[in-house]
UniProtKB/Swiss-Prot annotation:
Organism of derivation: Saccharomyces cerevisiae (strain ATCC 204508 / S288c)
GO-annotated cellular components: cytoplasm
Biological-process GO terms, alphabetical: ascospore formation; ascospore wall assembly; positive regulation of ascospore-type prospore membrane formation
Location of region: Disordered: 428-452
Subcellular location: Cytoplasm
Protein name: Sporulation-specific protein 77
Lineage: Eukaryota, Fungi, Dikarya, Ascomycota, Saccharomycotina
Signal peptide, first to last residue: none
Compositional bias (Low complexity): 432-444
Purpose of the protein: Required for spore wall assembly and ascus formation.
Keywords annotated in UniProt: Cytoplasm, Sporulation
Length: 477
């Protein structure tokens, strides 16, 4: 599904709803001219903390202070720089702890820039975001030093090791690693750090989810496809909790941060939120975060019961009941549904990439079967609620990966899940048929050639049959 691409000029900025089998490019996703414009923003790590995290993992949580250390690259030299956002100062820290102000800050009040505050450092670009770690540097956990060959479009081939200050962001910006040698745990740590550092921080983050997150996940996938895995030593066991929390971080970035940055779309009808049925969404909009645990997020996604058409219908009902006083409220609900569905879709695409990566390095076997089936259930629900049948292509692929090289238990789990899904669909159809209002909406939609809904059973039935056939073929092998 996700293959290497040849088109270095491929632009994925507006490709929210591309079919998932589309061939994403993995080379030069971020042009060199734009590298310097990619920023990072610190997040309060307390938002990531899950109640289910073990005490051992909590001791390894990453913390940020008010001052963030950034390394700027001058050839092979790296100079730490401290950012004090309150005073607008960039202090270059010398070895003798003295400050040598060698920087340039531009405060732009030009109306053409929409009042945006911009900062620029007199250096090539900000290469890496560094942050302190509670129990020492992750590099100290590595048992040996691996060597890479880094190729970029505008630089000569350079050789470096883990001890050098080569930024993770550079590895994600069109660079390809030709050779390396890592243990399984080192891969886990590297992925964790890379995705933690690389954040969406542009003015319109919802337009950059695919542009920044997905291509870099693809780069990671292709990078890890070619690595040589070393056997983990007895004292360096694979840390499942760290990998699961890596996924939580990705979801948190896309889900929470993007939704919060789009809160301006909802301020116009904030008074009408009390009429909105989804309490979880209201909770999110008010800035309350019940949990960032991946399983909790999956479960709460089920409670979003409004497709675009259903949201529009709900707005009309409010109008008829005089609960809203102008048609702008209806339009705002539709706008919010579009933004929300886009965010959800990008989360699902990221999950497909993550699951594919997990399989490529044998992580899929370590992933909880219950979490996996919850993930599949969420994907199917998103297909129905947001009318994205192309997503079935990705669902089918990751199910096949999940079943591969695993006989017995997973086949039984999948068979039981399919039977339960079919039963739920039949019960749902019976409820819809007994509801006169639902019947009228369905009939009117079927008459409209441009209707937003499709017959759910016509889609899910062959899909379930496909899975059952696949399941049977696996069980007979």
């Amino acid at each position: 599904m996700f293959r290497r691409g040849d088109n270095s000029n491929f632009n994925v900025q507006n490709s929210f709803f591309l079919p998932l089998e589309y061939e994403y490019t993995v080379k030069d996703n971020v042009p060199s001219k734009k590298k310097s414009s990619i920023g990072f923003f610190p997040l309060d790590d307390s938002l990531f903390t899950s109640k289910n995290n073990s005490g051992h993992h909590k001791s390894e949580q990453l913390h940020r202070g008010n001052a963030e250390t950034i390394r700027s690259q001058f050839g092979t030299d790296a100079v730490p720089i401290r950012i004090d956002e309150k005073e607008g100062k960039w202090d270059r820290i010398q070895d003798d702890n003295s400050s040598n102000l060698n920087y340039q800050i531009n405060n732009s009040n030009d109306p053409a820039s929409s009042g945006k505050y911009t900062q620029s450092i007199d250096c090539n670009h900000i290469a890496e975001s560094k942050f302190s770690k509670k129990n020492g540097n992750i590099d100290s956990l590595r048992s040996n030093s691996a060597t890479f060959m880094l190729n970029t479009a505008d630089e000569d081939v350079i050789e470096f090791s883990f001890d050098d200050n080569v930024p993770y962001a550079e590895l994600l910006s069109g660079a390809t690693l030709e050779k390396c040698s890592l243990t399984l745990n080192e891969i886990n740590k590297k992925l964790f750090n890379t995705l933690y550092d690389f954040r969406v921080s542009k003015d319109n983050p919802e337009e950059n989810l695919v542009e920044l997150i997905l291509p870099n996940c693809v780069v990671l996938l292709n990078f890890f496809e070619d690595i040589e895995l070393l056997a983990d030593s007895s004292d360096e066991a694979f840390e499942k909790s760290t990998f699961i929390n890596t996924i939580e971080f990705i979801v948190h970035d896309i889900w929470v941060e993007t939704l919060i940055k789009n809160i301006n779309l909802l301020q116009m009808f904030d008074a009408d939120l009390k009429c909105y049925n989804d309490k979880y969404i209201i909770c999110k909009l008010k800035g309350q975060y019940p949990s960032t645990n991946i399983v909790d997020i999956m479960c709460r996604l089920k409670h979003f019961s409004n497709s675009i058409l259903e949201t529009f219908k709900f707005g009309i009902e409010l109008k008829e009941q005089d609960q809203c006083h102008n048609r702008n409220t209806i339009i705002n609900y539709v706008l919010f549904s579009r933004v929300f569905s886009t965010i959800v879709l990008e989360i699902q695409k990221c999950f497909i990439l993550i699951v594919k990566f997990m399989y490529s390095v044998n992580f899929l076997e370590k992933f909880s079967d219950e979490v996996f089936l919850s993930f599949i259930e969420i994907l199917i629900k998103i297909v129905f609620e947001h009318q994205i049948p192309q997503l079935f292509l990705g669902i089918d692929e990751i199910i096949q990966l999940w079943l591969k090289n695993n006989e017995g238990k997973r086949q039984q789990l999948l068979s039981a899940w399919c039977n339960g899904t079919v039963q739920d669909m039949k019960q749902s159809q019976q409820r819809e048929s007994s509801n006169a209002e639902s019947e009228s909406i369905t009939s009117s939609t079927e008459e409209d050639e441009e209707g937003l809904q499709f017959n759910k059973w016509d889609v899910i039935e062959p899909f379930i049959d496909n899975i059952k056939a696949l399941n049977q073929s696996k069980s007979h092998m």
